[in-house]
């Protein structure tokens, strides 16, 4: 009959286990006046009674407490599982929040480093452009002044030639000599202008070449700085992520 009562549960426990949990006292007496357990099925499976109703005679405790213990044990196990699941869910949510914070901090650092790099690059390019414009303006002013000086000297030479031609119109030899001298002077002036022009072109080419070298060097430095910056950010990010993972694992384990 006791086995029939135990079959009502999906996972019945051995009768010896229930009997071990019953407190020691008087043995079951036939004079107790209580009917057998088979005549009281409702009392054996009445799980809604309080613990006070289960604290009767020792014989009632031995007959009625076994199924009640099974039910309460299952309820406590389900509650413990729910508590553990809630704690795991809270730890996972906290872990996800830490990862999101780390990713946001990483993104802010990358944006800050990128803005700083672009700002420094723009400043360098503006400085190079300003230097180039100043050098070109300086060369223009310098060679313009030299051209003006040569032109003024040329005009003075022509004026002298005309004056001397008028004065020495009657003296052919002297006029021829002066003409030859004037041609020589003009050739020298033309040669000087040609040299100045060639120097001007060469100076412009040198300036452009230097600027190209400066741009190339600046670009190489920028690439190196960006590579170093990327490596630094990746190392910091890995360290931060490892620290977060270690912290989360410690909080989960301890």
Swiss-Prot record:
Where do the record's region annotations for Important for oligomerization and fiber formation lie? 87-92, 249-254
The annotated region (Disordered) lies at: 1-65
The PTM Phosphothreonine maps to 218
Where does this protein reside within or beyond the cell?
Nucleus; Chromosome; Chromosome, Centromere
Q: Which residues form a coiled coil?
A: 84-241
Comp. bias regions, Basic and acidic residues: 40-55
| Basic residues bias locations | 17-31
Which stretch is the leader sequence? none
Keyword Plastid part of the UniProt annotation: no
UniProt PTM comment: Phosphorylated.
For this UniProt entry, the molecular function terms from Gene Ontology, in alphabetical order, are:
DNA binding
Interaction with DNA, as annotated region = 71-76, 106-109
Q: Where is this motif: Nuclear localization signal?
A: 106-109
**Organs and tissues of expression:** Detected in oocytes. Detected in spermatocytes and testis (at protein level).
An annotated GO cellular component: chromosome
Q: What does gene deletion cause?
A: Homozygous males with null mutations have smaller testes and are sterile, due to massive apoptotic cell death of male germ cells during meiotic prophase. Spermatocytes fail to form axial/lateral elements and synaptonemal complexes, and the chromosomes in the mutant spermatocytes do not synapse. In contrast, females are fertile and generate healthy offspring. However, they exhibit a sharp reduction in litter size that increases with advancing maternal age. In contrast to wild-type, a high percentage of the mutant embryos display aneuploidy.
Question: Where Phosphoserine occurs, residue numbers?
Answer: 8, 10-11, 55, 57, 77
Summarizing the function annotation, the protein's role is: Component of the synaptonemal complexes (SCS), formed between homologous chromosomes during meiotic prophase. Required for centromere pairing during meiosis in male germ cells. Required for normal meiosis during spermatogenesis and male fertility. Plays a lesser role in female fertility. Required for efficient phosphorylation of HORMAD1 and HORMAD2.
Q: Which family does it belong to?
A: Belongs to the XLR/SYCP3 family.
UniProt free text on domains: Composed of a long central coiled coil domain. The N-terminal and C-terminal regions interact with DNA.
Its assembly, as annotated, is: Component of the lateral elements of synaptonemal complexes. Homotetramer; the tetrameric helix bundles assemble end to end into long homopolimeric fibers that exhibit a transversal striation with a periodicity of about 20 nm (in vitro). Interacts with SYCP2. Forms a complex with EWSR1, PRDM9, REC8 and SYCP1; complex formation is dependent of phosphorylated form of REC8 and requires PRDM9 bound to hotspot DNA; EWSR1 joins PRDM9 with the chromosomal axis through REC8.
The protein in question is named: Synaptonemal complex protein 3
Which organism is this protein's natural source? Answer: Mus musculus
For this protein's source organism, the top of the classification is: Eukaryota, Metazoa, Chordata, Craniata, Vertebrata
């Amino acid at each position: 009959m006791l086995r029939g009562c135990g079959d009502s549960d999906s996972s019945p426990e051995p009768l010896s286990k229930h009997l071990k949990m019953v407190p020691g006292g008087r043995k079951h007496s036939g004079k107790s006046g209580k009917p057998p357990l088979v005549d009281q099925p409702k009392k054996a499976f009445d799980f809604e009674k309080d613990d006070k109703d289960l604290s009767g005679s020792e014989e009632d405790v031995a007959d009625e407490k076994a199924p009640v213990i099974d039910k309460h044990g299952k309820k406590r196990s389900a509650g413990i599982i729910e508590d553990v699941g809630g704690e795991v869910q809270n730890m996972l949510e906290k872990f996800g929040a830490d990862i999101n914070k780390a990713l946001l901090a990483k993104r802010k650092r990358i944006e800050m480093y990128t803005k700083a790099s672009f700002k420094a690059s723009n400043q360098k390019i503006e400085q190079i452009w300003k230097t180039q414009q100043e050098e070109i303006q300086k060369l223009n002013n310098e060679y313009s002044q030299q051209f003006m000086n040569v032109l003024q000297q040329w005009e003075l030479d022509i004026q002298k030639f005309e004056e001397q031609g008028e004065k020495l119109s009657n003296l052919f030899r002297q006029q021829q000599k002066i003409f030859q001298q004037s041609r020589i002077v003009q050739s020298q002036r033309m040669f000087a202008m040609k040299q100045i022009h060639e120097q001007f072109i060469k100076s412009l080419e040198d300036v452009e070449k230097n600027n190209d070298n400066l741009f190339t060097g600046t670009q190489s430095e920028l690439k190196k700085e960006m590579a170093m910056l990327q490596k630094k950010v990746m190392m910091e990010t890995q360290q931060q992520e490892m620290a977060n993972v270690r912290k989360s694992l410690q909080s989960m384990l301890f």
